[in-house]
């Protein structure tokens, strides 16, 4: 036996190199035999159609370290355990026996291999989620008759102060265009693109002229620039600024009012987590999830901070994936709009959307106003309303509003010009007939016994999904940039949550379809 003395001045001890008898059991089955989730992830992956997944690696050249099916199993399992970064997944592949079992003797992939694989499956993850939901439907774990929808904002992986505002861009663009039109004598009716085209044409002509005349440009102190050089530099500056403004507006598109310079798909939104209490805007994505029977059945990633504009495109996607299976749509007050009501009616879906004035309708002031409205008598011949004391409300105009989605709503405006009550000379009432009709139907639905039960399930299932993501898995900020990456990330998270839910049901020996009952 050889003694090695440590000569460090900080410690004084002796290290002994001795022989240690190791007893290793290479049968990992012994250690993971009771892990339901591990066996479940393998069983589910085996039932998926992974033809496209197997094509992500080329059949030519070097063989991949780990085959794509095993890589998918590893990523889904790690996500279900709250492990998201490539380096943490790499560490799990090296030291976690459960992941070693999935690898089945293969070499542990490094973080670059894991990241490359995630990039290769960006377009495949939505279909994998859809296939998993179909398996759960076949196993009688999901009933799609009631869909519970909710949304949340998750911060993007972008710098918080990298904002570009539409208002600022449009303001400076307008000022510059006015200046250019005045200097160049252009028509006031020209659009920004036409002004840019005119400036570019003049700039190119001047550049060609300077080249032909061999005009020398000078820079620095004590140098006097020619008129041609000054005009050239001014036109170049105008051209570059106009192109920059146009690029900013193109990135934002028609519906957004901001974007981040470090993640062009992220929009600045007001978050619930406001530690400074100043309403600070942060770059984020609006994430929509649809739940049924405790499982996530669909996702939607939106630039728009309002939930109202996300419902219609989200439902189109769900109807395409699960044709003829959806019956009831349950959502909170943020989704209420005439456009959404009409879409639900056209697709024969029952609305359980909570009216945005539901809490306000319980106040004494609102009840008094509604009592006044209900006592009005409508005269069809004159198209006017008459109050109980004979006051006439004459239809003055129709107010049309064009929403960002392109949908146009019409509100009829009736005014009484001789009201002379409560300090008011006139009084107006505004009636949106289509919206009011659907709102009353939805209100009736949510107040019924069935509606109370559906609202209870929405609050538990839909909001519970985001609780599991943010609190359960501690996922409060994305780790990737770009909408395509975010969609893939949300799909993987949804698959992981579904895996956890099914594991919990199996361990608790409760495989009935989840439906919470009102007390």
Where are these regions (language model features)?
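Anion-binding and metal-coordination hotspots
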Residues: 15, 75, 82-95, 106-519
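Basic, short loop/linker segments at the boundary and entry of helix-turn-helix/winged-helix-like folds
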Residues: 32-76
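Short, charged, low-complexity loops and linkers
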Residues: 23-32, 448-453
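Short, flexible loop/hinge motifs at secondary-structure junctions
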Residues: 1-27, 180, 204, 219, ...
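A ubiquitous short alpha-helical element
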Residues: 11, 57-62, 450-453
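Short helix-loop boundary/capping segments at the starts of domains
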Residues: 46-54, 77-84, 95-102
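Short secondary-structure transition/capping motifs
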Residues: 30, 62-67, 78-82, 103, ...
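Catalytic micro-motifs at enzyme active sites that drive phosphoryl/nucleotidyl and oxygen chemistry
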Residues: 63, 100-106, 134
